Amino acid sequence: MSDAQQITLIVDGEETKVTEGTTGAELFFERRDVVVARVNGVLKDLDQVLTEGADVEGVTIDSPDGLNVLRHSTAHVMAQAVQQLRPEAKLGIGPYITDGFYFDFDVADPFTPEDLRTLEKMMQKIINQNQKFVRRVVTEEEAREAMANEPYKLELLGKKNDASDAAEGVNVEVGAGDITIYDNVDRKSGESIWCDLCRGPHLQNTKIISNAFALTRSSAAYWLGNQNNQQLQRIYGTAWPTKEALKAYQERIAEAERRDHRKLGVELDLFSFPDELGSGLPVFHPKGGIIRKAMEDYSRQRHVDAGYEFVYTPHITKGHLYEVSGHLDWYKDGMFPAMQVDAEFNEDGSVRKPAQDYYLKPMNCPMHNLIFRSRGRSYRELPLRLFEFGSVYRYEKSGVVHGLTRVRGMTQDDAHIYCTREQMKDELTTTLNFVLGLLKDYGLDDFYLELSTKNEEKFVGDDAAWEEATRTLSEVAEASGLHLVPDPGGAAFYGPKISVQAKDALGRTWQMSTIQLDFNLPERFELEYQAADGTRQRPVMIHRALFGSVERFMGVLTEHYAGAFPAWLAPVQVVGIPVAETFNDYMFDVVGQLKAAGIRAEVDISSDRFPKKIRTASKDKIPFVLIAGGEDAEAGAVSFRFRDGSQDNGVPVAEAVRRIVDAVKNRES
C-alpha cells in the first residue's frame, strides 16, 4: 500500500496510519464496546469516513457519552414502535436524559401501563431485526418533504438557527450545521422502515440495544415545555449496556421510591400539601415541625458562633425595590404577579392616588442591602454578616413543583456578607469551610463543587468585575481540594457562584449550598463604607444560602435517612414499652428522667399487644426503644432495642439515660 493511499490519524492519543477512506467502524473493529467516535472533539457515527490529521477517540457504550447515544437510539426504536401501534401518532422530541430518555407524542388518548408493556414487546422485535441506523444529510426542502406529516418536526425546522434557546431537547433534533435525518433501515431489503429528524449520532444498529431496556412511565407534557402549547403524551424509558446494569438501576429506583420524602412525609406524619392552599405550599405537622426546629436551632447556634448577626424582613415590598435590584428586569417570570394596593379614589370614582405594585419577595438580598444602607458604615464593621431565615415566594411552573424539593413558598437560610475587596478571598474561603462543616454535621459528607459563570445573554455589570469575581471564586474552590466542575452560563444575573453538590445515601447528587460573589448590587444600591483613609468605598457582597431552602433540605435529609433520622433530629427519640401494664408506672418514671434531660420520649400505653408495639416503633423509625419487665424493674434497669433489631438487656437506667443523652448531644447517626 503506497503512502498516497494512507492518511495519518491520532487515535486515542497515538499517531496511526490507516487507509484513506477508513471509517470509525473499521478503525475500532476489534473493540466491540465502542459505539461512536469522538473526532476532533465532536461525537460522530462510526460509519463516517475519517480524514487526514483527525484526532479520534473511541467512545465506549458504558461511558457517559456512550450511554447517551444508547439511550437516544433506544428512544428512536420506541418512537418507531409507537407509530406502529398508533399510526396516527405525531412525533415531538425524543432526547436522552439522566439515566434514560423520553419521547413526546401527539395522540388522542394517553398511554396506559398495558400500552407500555405492548410497546416493549414491539421494541424487542425491532431490536432483534438488527435494523441499521443510517444518517443522511438533507436540504431544508428535502427535510420538509420527508417530515410532511409531522407538524412538530416542521416547526422545529423553523427553529433551526435558535434551537439551543427553544427548549430542552430541541437541539438533539436540529441546530447549527447540516440538517440530518436518521433512517431505521431493514437489513435485508435496504429500505427505510422509519425515520426521524435528528442530529445524532446513533448506534450502528438496533441489535446493540439488546434487551437491557425498559419503559418506565408516561405523563402529559406541553410541547416545548410551554403551557400555552398543545399538551402531548410523554413516554419515559431507560437503557443500559447489560441486563445486570438495568437490574441494578431498577433496584436503585425501587429504593428511591421507598425513600420518597412525599411518601414518608405521610407515613411518618411530618408534612402535607393541602389542595386548599395551592401547589407547592407545604404545611408542617407537629412531628415535622420538631425536625425543622431542630435543624434551624442547630444552624442558628452555629451562625452565632461564626459571627453572623440576625435580621428579619417582611414578606412583601413595593415593586420599586426590585426595579433597583434588577429582579423585575431579569427575574420577573419567577415572581408572583404584582398586587396593586394603596390606591385612593375621589367620590366620583376618579383616581386621586394611583395604586402601587407590591410583590411577594422572591429573594432577601435587596432588603438586606437596605439594612446595610440604613446608616453610615465603617471598614471596622466589615465583614458584616447578616443572616435570616427568610420566607420567599417564587412562581414555579406547576409541572416542576415537586414535594418539598421544589416549592413555591420556602424559607431560605439566607446570609449576605459585606466585606472589603481585600477581605473577599479570605471571607469566601471561611464561608465555604463553614458551609461544608455544617453540611457534614447533618450527615452529608460526599461533595464536589460547581462553578457557574456569566450568562452572556443575561447579566448586569461590567466584564472586568465579572472576570475578577469568577477568578476569585475559582481560586477558592480549587484551594478546597474538592473536584470542581464548570457550569458555563449558569450564574444568576448579578454574579458568578460556587454551588456545593452533595451525594446522598443512594449516590444521587443534590445541589445544596450556594456562594455567590456580587460587585453589582452594591453598585445598584449605592452601598458605601468609610475606608481607613477616609474615602467612601463600595463593599463586596457575598450571597450565601446553606440549605438552599429549609424545605428542600428537609426533603433531601428525609430521603438520605429513609425517614430514620439520627436521634438528634428524630421527632420522637425514645419510646418506652412496658412488657405488661403492671410496669407502666416504672416506665413512666424512666421516661420522666429522659424528659428532664431534654430527650423527646414517650410511653406506649396503647391497648396493642407487646409485639405490635415493637412493630409500631419500628415502623415509626424510633431511634431507641426501651423495654421494661419484671427483672428490669427489680434491677432498676431497662432493655435497649435499636433500629436494626439488636438488643442490649439489663442496662441500668442512669446509664441508659446517659447513653441516649450522649447520642443526641454528639449527633450520632
From Swiss-Prot:
<dbReference type="InterPro" id="IPR006195">
    <property type="entry name" value="aa-tRNA-synth_II"/>
</dbReference>
<keyword id="KW-0963">Cytoplasm</keyword>
<protein>
    <recommendedName>
        <fullName>Threonine--tRNA ligase</fullName>
        <ecNumber>6.1.1.3</ecNumber>
    </recommendedName>
</protein>
<dbReference type="InterPro" id="IPR002320">
    <property type="entry name" value="Thr-tRNA-ligase_IIa"/>
</dbReference>
<dbReference type="InterPro" id="IPR002314">
    <property type="entry name" value="aa-tRNA-synt_IIb"/>
</dbReference>
<feature type="binding site">
    <location>
        <position position="543"/>
    </location>
    <ligand>
        <name>Zn(2+)</name>
    </ligand>
</feature>
<dbReference type="Pfam" id="PF03129">
    <property type="entry name" value="HGTP_anticodon"/>
</dbReference>
<dbReference type="GO" id="GO:0000049">
    <property type="term" value="F:tRNA binding"/>
</dbReference>
<comment type="similarity">
    <text>Belongs to the class-II aminoacyl-tRNA synthetase family.</text>
</comment>
<keyword id="KW-0820">tRNA-binding</keyword>
<keyword id="KW-0648">Protein biosynthesis</keyword>
<keyword id="KW-0067">ATP-binding</keyword>
<feature type="binding site">
    <location>
        <position position="416"/>
    </location>
    <ligand>
        <name>Zn(2+)</name>
    </ligand>
</feature>
<dbReference type="InterPro" id="IPR004095">
    <property type="entry name" value="TGS"/>
</dbReference>
<comment type="function">
    <text>Catalyzes the attachment of threonine to tRNA(Thr) in a two-step reaction: L-threonine is first activated by ATP to form Thr-AMP and then transferred to the acceptor end of tRNA(Thr). Also edits incorrectly charged L-seryl-tRNA(Thr).</text>
</comment>
<dbReference type="GO" id="GO:0006435">
    <property type="term" value="P:threonyl-tRNA aminoacylation"/>
</dbReference>
<dbReference type="InterPro" id="IPR018163">
    <property type="entry name" value="Thr/Ala-tRNA-synth_IIc_edit"/>
</dbReference>
<dbReference type="InterPro" id="IPR004154">
    <property type="entry name" value="Anticodon-bd"/>
</dbReference>
<dbReference type="Pfam" id="PF00587">
    <property type="entry name" value="tRNA-synt_2b"/>
</dbReference>
<dbReference type="InterPro" id="IPR045864">
    <property type="entry name" value="aa-tRNA-synth_II/BPL/LPL"/>
</dbReference>
<dbReference type="InterPro" id="IPR012947">
    <property type="entry name" value="tRNA_SAD"/>
</dbReference>
<dbReference type="GO" id="GO:0005737">
    <property type="term" value="C:cytoplasm"/>
</dbReference>
<feature type="binding site">
    <location>
        <position position="365"/>
    </location>
    <ligand>
        <name>Zn(2+)</name>
    </ligand>
</feature>
<dbReference type="InterPro" id="IPR047246">
    <property type="entry name" value="ThrRS_anticodon"/>
</dbReference>
<keyword id="KW-0479">Metal-binding</keyword>
<feature type="region of interest" description="Catalytic">
    <location>
        <begin position="260"/>
        <end position="566"/>
    </location>
</feature>
<keyword id="KW-0862">Zinc</keyword>
<dbReference type="Pfam" id="PF07973">
    <property type="entry name" value="tRNA_SAD"/>
</dbReference>
<dbReference type="GO" id="GO:0005524">
    <property type="term" value="F:ATP binding"/>
</dbReference>
<dbReference type="GO" id="GO:0004829">
    <property type="term" value="F:threonine-tRNA ligase activity"/>
</dbReference>
<comment type="subunit">
    <text>Homodimer.</text>
</comment>
<dbReference type="InterPro" id="IPR036621">
    <property type="entry name" value="Anticodon-bd_dom_sf"/>
</dbReference>
<keyword id="KW-0694">RNA-binding</keyword>
<keyword id="KW-0547">Nucleotide-binding</keyword>
<dbReference type="InterPro" id="IPR033728">
    <property type="entry name" value="ThrRS_core"/>
</dbReference>
<feature type="domain" description="TGS">
    <location>
        <begin position="3"/>
        <end position="60"/>
    </location>
</feature>
<keyword id="KW-0030">Aminoacyl-tRNA synthetase</keyword>
<dbReference type="GO" id="GO:0046872">
    <property type="term" value="F:metal ion binding"/>
</dbReference>
<keyword id="KW-0436">Ligase</keyword>
